[in-house]
Amino acid sequence: MVSLKDIAKECQVSVATVSKALNDHADISEERKKMIREKAEEMGYRPNLFARTLKTNRSYNIGVLFTDAEHNGLTHDYFAAVLDSFKVAAEARDYDLTFVNCGGSGGKRMTYLEHARYQGFDGIMIACVDFSEPEVLQLALSDIPVVTIDYIFNDRLAVVSDNAKGMEDLFTYIYQMGHRRIAYIHGTDSAVTTNRLSSFYGTAEKLGVEIPDEYVMMTRYRDTKGAGEATEKLLDLRRPPTCIIYPDDFAAFGGIHVIRERGMSIPEDISIAGYDGIRLAKLTVPNLTTLCQDTQHLGQYAAEKLIDLIEKPKTAMRNITIVQGKLYEGQTVLKLDGSRG
């Protein structure tokens, strides 16, 4: 097993210097830290977790609370991608992840906070939960460092997608493609939905596009059946939309199924757009027009900022980080000549 002494000998520095470099002390230059860390990795050094825990009074374990209303779990493409980048960034700083749940030893039920304390989590990442639930509030308001994803809660650390700008970019693109009859099937009530819906109406007003009430419908996120039923209603209108925006890419697949069952072609007969930019959307034929969320940076920033707060609680900033998405034009929004818009 490689020791600090072995690394010190290779780097021609003291054991104390190696220890400081590996523990990110401020009194060593970044250049020297980098050199020592690279050498340690090259030599296959792995710190003794028990010794490190005793020394730092930390478990090097971060809890993840993820309980979306539809119970999708890790089949939730968007949050699975966010979690993956969070995991990579956390592991790069030697932290493990454990899911927060209500199960305890001997089958005894625990609250989220009780489970977090039982596991000794250094911090918690909270994503896709209902903040009106008492147990969620209890955990979020505790003294355990917390970062929330896509939700701003009190003075807690938060990393959020710019949903308002994302919807503005998506709507504007559809408008520039000649569409004026634009419908929106939005998700159920949440901070994300509120931001997107406000931006949808705001962008329409700015561009002079009238949105009839019957053009706006609601379904659950990732609900292909609900999205399909809403699509049926929109297509049955006396003056149907020329483009439908779905709450997310997965829900859009439900709309695609209904449209094709009617013998209609996308985008020749009806244009559609999704939201999220999941990998599967780029495999459809034609490729789905969508707003790609930057899951890589959402997860990475959340992990890095949470760990900074864990390790440097007196100096780490408890701020809100906004991550921009990017329009993927795809092939499902037809360029209109003006006669159909």
Positions of predicted regions on the chain:
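Short gly/ser/thr-rich secondary-structure transition/capping motifs
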Residues: E42-N48, S105-K108, V129, I256
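Bacterial carbohydrate/catabolite-sensing allosteric modules
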Residues: E42, S85-Y95, L141-T148, I152-G341
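N-terminal helix-turn-helix DNA-binding module of bacterial transcription factors
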Residues: M1-Y60, S339-R340
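Small/polar loops that bind or transfer phosphate-bearing groups
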Residues: K20, N101, A127-C128, T219, ...
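Alpha-helical recognition/docking segments in bacterial nutrient-uptake
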Residues: V2, N57, N61-T172, Q176, ...
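Residues at alpha-helix caps and immediate loop-helix transition turns in enzyme cores, especially N-
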Residues: R32, T75-Y78, E135-Q138, T193-R196, ...
